[in-house]
Swiss-Prot record:
Transit peptide: 1-65
Positions that bind [4Fe-4S] cluster: C219, C222
Presence of the UniProt keyword Protein biosynthesis in the record: no
Known function: Molecular scaffold for [Fe-S] cluster assembly of mitochondrial iron-sulfur proteins.
InterPro entries named among the record's database cross-references: FSCA_dom_sf, Nfu/NifU_N, Nfu/NifU_N_sf, NIF_FeS_clus_asmbl_NifU_C, RNA-helicase_DEAD-box_CS
Protein name per the record: NFU1 iron-sulfur cluster scaffold homolog, mitochondrial
Cellular component terms per the entry's GO annotation: mitochondrion
Keywords recorded for this protein, A-Z: Iron, Iron-sulfur, Metal-binding, Mitochondrion, Transit peptide
Amino acid sequence: MSKFLSQAAINTLRNTRLGSRQLVRSFAGISNTRNHREAGHQEWGCGQSAGRGLLELRMPVACRRSMFIQTQDTPNPESLKFLPGVDVLGKGNTYDFPNGTTAHSSPLAKLLFRVEGVKGVFFGADFITISKQEGAEWSLIKPEVFAVIMDFFASGLPVLNDAQPNADTEILEDDDETVMMIKELLDTRIRPTVQEDGGDIVFMGYEAGVVKLKMQGSCSSCPSSIVTLKNGVQNMLQFYIPEVESVEQVFDEADRMIDSEFERFEKNLKTLKQQEPSGGGPH
């Protein structure tokens, strides 16, 4: 009975968000019927069995009952959203780990980056978005991610150690009226929709009519992110705030350099493995 009530509660929450999601997507000209998304994949744990993906796990019964993990597709085929059924960072909070070197502040992120094929990790209020390396298979990554998530939340360890979630839309004393309106609109109308897709938009600044934003999570490498940014976010900001002339996407150069180094390291590692002599006894 409790399982059905939990699912009903989840459906109710989704329905309450529908209005704002339709509003943002109407500005972007995006249909609500997305062919690329299969909503509501429901899975339990880390190794599928018959039926609805019920998974056997070597954990106490109480832990198994409390950890109900769902997966949800995102607009980015390289990213998948995991919903563990418990708070990850809490309402409105997000944190991005674009690569393994940024995971030092989170025990959970460190463990997830140990899963082969994981390229990026993103924490939301009640979800975790995993971005995979090109060519990696979800069928191999998902069971490992399920196991890490379930074991971690059963341990009771904090998700973040000494880091603070994004506070980019917090109103500051020196913010002028336009900046305050931009932050308010991002926080109340735009970010909830983007977070539903497993990502986030971070406010980086406003100058001379230009709003600078950084895409995170599934949105950072999504093929449609530019369309969403220009046609959806920009149109909405301009509709409510006449001072806004355009929206620009900001890229973190440090993250780009780290990603480049990781790619080079992985290529070198593959080359070394290919050069290793095949196993065999002495000749």
